[in-house]
Design a protein with these regions (language model features):
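Long, folded non-catalytic interaction modules
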Residues: 1-152, 158, 162
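Short, solvent-exposed amphipathic alpha-helical segments in soluble enzyme
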Residues: 4-10, 257-260, 338-341, 361-362
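Short hydrophobic alpha-helical runs that function as membrane-insertion/retention elements
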Residues: 13-15, 291-292, 343-347
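Short, surface-exposed amphipathic charged segments that create phosphate/polyanion-binding patches used
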Residues: 27-35, 284-289, 360-361
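Short, surface-exposed beta-strand/loop "edge" segments at domain boundaries and coil↔beta transitions
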Residues: 28-35, 250-251, 332-334
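A domain-level signal for caspase-like cysteine endopeptidase catalytic cores
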Residues: 111, 115-290
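Active-site-proximal C-terminal subdomain of hydrolase catalytic domains
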Residues: 320, 325-494
Length: 494
């Protein structure tokens, strides 16, 4: 499994043999280096990809590429000559260079996929190859088979709310939680093990196998194949459904005004309050791009005005993606995906209403700017620990709209002195703008392009230059670990 994306990218054949090696143009390269087979294969994929990007600037992509500057300062390769060589000869010369020499120029990878090695998982291989994912094969839940009961007390308490940590909706107050039932152990009666995966140095991480991975999305074979059946709305309109089933949570209802605040994109936003089980079931069968649910989820299902709708009873769901912004909504969200949704965002534990409202608003704004489900949640987790109580089920590659910049990006800003600021820009590849796309931040005087994945660069800007950068488009900005928005920032107040 781990070698599939590399073989796909190179157009290579995979054969059974006694040694793990890559053969190219008469040369042979070991794939079982000191860091192990999986890590070595990942390094080879990244190295060949990087040097391919640089070599292609000799052809139709005649741009000033930042990665080329870094590579040329570290190695002596004749890229004009390499451009005219056959692929096998190119690969052979690429791999003569030690990876560590190029490491600083390798872009942050988009996706790491942890796939439990089982014949049932084989059908996901073509989809992972298409995304050029780094594929790893854990033997079971977590790097050492650790379950939630094996984790540290701090992590365990993350899933099992202690008495007094949150209040149920029956205890009305400023910090009531989005749950109407007090669970004795704080769990959602999950029938699968919650566990940790080995961390990944990629923007996104997904898992294929049994169990519920902490800090990663969860995909199944069926959900990958659902990508092939996706049919975009014929009229070109982006349809969003906002459902609020608790009047005390109406503060989050303003997300209906957030979706659709984009020029040149036609939206159809509808808001529904206090819906019944039949009405919610009908909404879920609607051909809509996104459902933003605000309310309660209990063991009986999604709370409605006349009872509970158990998503496991639904035969069909036509909403593409969703946010179930309620306590312990994993099981109901999993059922929505099983019934036909492409992907969604759910919670694994109780969430305070104030936290859920804040995250719900941020989700709306990030999706409205072209972020995928997984990249959006990863960005939120950087500045809000409680966002780690949320996870993606189904296809985390799903997006609501495309970014104005093509590849969406976020900026981090620090003031250096009265007139100068340090600005770091991070890019987040999507299904429409995947690994290999190039981009150029809108910074005055900058003519350099970058492979648009992860940290592009850090710039020193004057106050006027920073103002121009922030005015270019609405984008998320991190200031002192706070998530802000470029359209709301006064540079003089940073």
């Amino acid at each position: 499994l781990p070698v599939t994306p590399l073989a796909y990218y190179l157009g290579a054949t995979v054969e059974i043999g006694t040694e793990q090696r890559l053969h190219a143009d008469g040369e042979s390269f070991a794939l079982d280096g000191p860091k192990g087979f999986e890590a070595t294969v990942a390094r080879v994929l990244k190295q060949v990809f990087l040097l391919d990007c640089v070599t292609r600037t000799e052809g139709m992509y005649d741009v000033a590429l930042y990665e080329r500057e870094l590579v040329e300062s570290a190695v002596d390769l004749d890229f004009a000559r390499l451009y005219d060589l056959p692929l096998a000869a190119q690969v052979s010369e690429y791999l003569q260079v030690p990876y560590d020499v190029l490491a600083d120029a390798v872009p942050t990878w988009k996706l790491t996929a942890d796939v439990v090695p089982d014949t049932a998982a084989v059908p996901v291989v073509p989809f992972l190859a298409d995304e050029l994912a780094v594929v790893r094969c854990p033997e079971g839940p977590g790097p050492a088979g650790e379950s939630s009961t094996d984790l540290s007390p701090e992590v365990t308490s993350f899933f099992r709310s202690a008495n007094g940590l949150v209040r149920s909706a029956a205890q009305r107050g400023e910090s009531f939680a989005r749950s109407t039932t007090r669970h004795s152990d704080g769990s959602d009666d999950l029938d699968q093990t919650v566990f940790t995966l080995q961390s990944a140095d990629s923007i996104e991480q997904t898992y294929v196998g049994d169990g519920i991975p902490l800090g990663a999305g969860k995909m199944t074979v069926e959900e990958y194949y659902r990508r092939l059946d996706f049919d975009a709305a014929s009229d070109g309109r982006t349809r969003v459904l906002v459902v609020c089933n608790d009047p005390e949570m109406s503060d989050e209802n303003v997300v209906g005004d957030t979706y659709g605040t984009r020029d040149w994109i036609e939206f159809d936003i509808s808001t529904h309050e206090g819906v019944t089980t039949d009405e919610l079931a009908e909404l879920l069968t609607t051909d809509a791009d996104f459902l933003h649910y605000i309310g309660h989820v209990d063991p009986s299902g999604i709370r409605c005005a006349d009872g509970h709708l158990d998503a496991e009873t639904l035969d069909e769901v036509n909403v593409n993606a969703f946010l179930l912004n309620a306590c312990q909504s994993y099981s109901q969200g999993r059922a929505l995906v099983d019934a036909g949704a492409i992907g969604g965002i759910v919670t694994l534990t109780d969430v305070l209403n104030t936290t859920a409202t804040e995250i719900g608003r941020s989700v709306a704004r990030l999706l409205n700017q072209g972020f995928s489900l997984l990249s959006m949640l990863g960005l939120l987790e950087k500045r809000n620990l409680l966002a780690q109580r949320y996870m993606v089920v189904g296809d985390g590659n799903e997006t609501l709209v495309e970014s104005e910049s093509g590849t969406p990006y976020a900026a981090a800003i620090d003031r250096l002195d009265a007139e100068e600021f340090e600005v770091s820009v991070d890019a987040f590849p999507t299904k429409s703008f995947p690994m290999g796309c190039i981009m150029r931040p809108h910074i005055s005087g900058l003519n350099t392009y970058y492979v648009g994945s992860g940290r592009l660069d850090t710039y020193q800007l004057s106050q006027s230059e920073l103002t121009d950068f922030l005015d270019m488009q609405r984008t998320p900005v991190l200031i002192d670990d706070r998530l802000c928005w470029s359209s709301e920032i006064r540079v003089s107040e940073i």
